[in-house]
Amino acid sequence: MTQPDLLGTPEFERAGVAILRGFALTDDMALVAAIDAIVANAPFRHMTVPGGGRMSVAMTNAGIGWVADTKGYRYDRTDPLSGQPWPDMPSIFVDLARRAAHEAGFNFAPDGCLINRYEPGAKMGLHQDINEGDYSAPIVSVSLGLPATFQFGGLKRNDPVEKIALHHGDVVVWGGPARKSFHGVLTLKAGHHAIGGHRYNLTFRKVSPP
């Protein structure tokens, strides 16, 4: 199946959702270099959820950071491992997120980027992004590296879920009536890509209130 074969499924012909195939390809290696620079100051770590479990996805942040621990889920400007502010978002991050959002019909000024690293066997359960202070802003999600199966549902956990293959350089934008949709990633399969045997996901959000 080619990437064009995956376009235009009925589930995503709806207000607020855009799948931008290959949108980040021209910036891919610069994005990876920016990730490496961030990780040098704020290493990847496996966060703990309130129930005590350990997330299979390794995470770090730029800008205002998303944090999970036994106390709950929240945003914090400080990296709890170092006690220092999270690294600033590189200009290439901000520019890409703004351009992708504009392509999808949104104005967007992100102030937080959660960086996820999926190794084979890692996954992300269905969830909503609801810890932010500005639901009028969209979510912009960038895929780099190994392909993954993205799950995108409705506003209720038991709503039907669409499975869609995401490839290196693809960007998904959702906002408006779809802003609080449940979404997740199925278990990553082993493979090889030019950037390595893993997948990066950059999730851009507007954390601060409007």
Whereabouts are the PLM-identified features?
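Non-heme Fe(II) oxygenase metal-center motifs and adjacent flexible, charged/small-residue loops
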Residues: 1-210
